[in-house]
Regions:
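Ligand-binding "clamshell"
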Residues: 62-75, 207-212, 223-225
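Periplasmic-binding protein-like
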Residues: 64, 72-86, 89, 93-131, 175-176
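Periplasmic binding protein-like
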Residues: 51, 182-225
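Structural transition elements
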Residues: 121-154, 171-175
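Ligand-site clamp/hinge motif
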Residues: 17-63, 190
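Short, well-ordered beta-strand elements
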Residues: 1-4, 12-13, 28-34, 160-169, ...
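Gly/Pro-rich hinge or "lid" segments in bacterial periplasmic/extracellular proteins
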Residues: 1-25, 29, 146, 150
C-alpha cells in the first residue's frame, strides 16, 4: 500500500500499490484507525465500523470464543510483555524494600486472570515466550502480603505510604493497574492512578517526574534489537 494521509490521533489512509510485485489485495483503499479504548474498538467491530481489529480485551476475547455474529476470531500468539518500571532515583521507590513490597503484594496469576481471562500468562522473562530466542530467566515474586508489610516496615514505612502510578491512556495498562491497586492497598500502599495521553505520560516517565509506571514491550519483527 502507498501512504496518502495521516490524521494525527485518528487514522492513516493508504491506497493499493498496483505495481507491487506480489499478489494484489482485493480492496483498493486501506484506512488504519487509532482507537485507544479496547471496548470502543470491539463495538466498532461488532457494528461494522471497522473490518478488523487487534488487541481485544480479555472479556471480549471470551465472547469471541463463544461466537459473535458476523465476526471471526484469528487467535495468534502475542510477542508483547507488560512490566512495572520504578524510578530508582526517586526518594521512595529507590528503596529496594519498597520495590520488594510492591512485588510481594501482587498475586500475579490472579491479576492476569482478572485483566485478561485465559488470553495471557504470567511472564518469567523480559522476552515473550512466543519468540524463538526466549529463555527462562527468573521466577516472579510469590504472592506474600505479610512479607510485603515486613518490607515496608524495614524500608521505614510501618504505617504504609502513598504513591502515584502514571499511565499512558491504553486500556490494557489501566486494566492491569486497577487489578493491582487493591492488592497494594491491602498491604498499606495507597496507589493513585493517573492516566495521561501517551506523549505526556512518556515525558513524565523519561524526566523522572513519575514514581513508577507500567509499560509494555512488543517485538512484532521477532528481532530483540
Amino acid at each position: 500500500f502507498i501512504f496518502d494521509e495521516w490524521v494525527e490521533g485518528d487514522r492513516v489512509n493508504c491506497h493499493r500499490n498496483d505495481n507491487y510485485w506480489g499478489d494484489k489485495p482485493s480492496y483498493t483503499n486501506l484506512t488504519v484507525r487509532f482507537i485507544a479504548d479496547a471496548s470502543t474498538r470491539f463495538i466498532e467491530l461488532e457494528t461494522g465500523g471497522v473490518d478488523a481489529c487487534d488487541n481485544i480485551s480479555g472479556s471480549n476475547y471470551s465472547r469471541m470464543l463463544n461466537g459473535v455474529d458476523g465476526c471471526v476470531l484469528y487467535d495468534t500468539l502475542s510477542t508483547k510483555t507488560f512490566y512495572i518500571v520504578c524510578n530508582d532515583e526517586h526518594d521512595v521507590v529507590s528503596n529496594v524494600n519498597v520495590r520488594k513490597a510492591l512485588a510481594y503484594a501482587l498475586d500475579l496469576p490472579a491479576i492476569v486472570k482478572a485483566a485478561y481471562g485465559d488470553s495471557a500468562t504470567v511472564a518469567d522473562s523480559s522476552v515473550a515466550a512466543t519468540l524463538p530466542f526466549y529463555e527462562f530467566q527468573a521466577q516472579y515474586y510469590a504472592y506474600d502480603p505479610e512479607l510485603a508489610k515486613e518490607c515496608l516496615t524495614e524500608a521505614g514505612y510501618p504505617d504504609g505510604l502513598d504513591l502515584t502510578l502514571v499511565l499512558e491512556e491504553v486500556t490494557e495498562l489501566v486494566n492491569l493497574a486497577e487489578a493491582a491497586q487493591s492488592y497494594w492497598k491491602a498491604v498499606g500502599i495507597n496507589v493513585e492512578i493517573k492516566v495521561y495521553d501517551i506523549a505526556t505520560a512518556g515525558t513524565m516517565c523519561n524526566t523522572g517526574e513519575a514514581y513508577f509506571t507500567i509499560r509494555n514491550c512488543g517485538c512484532a519483527s521477532g528481532d530483540p534489537s
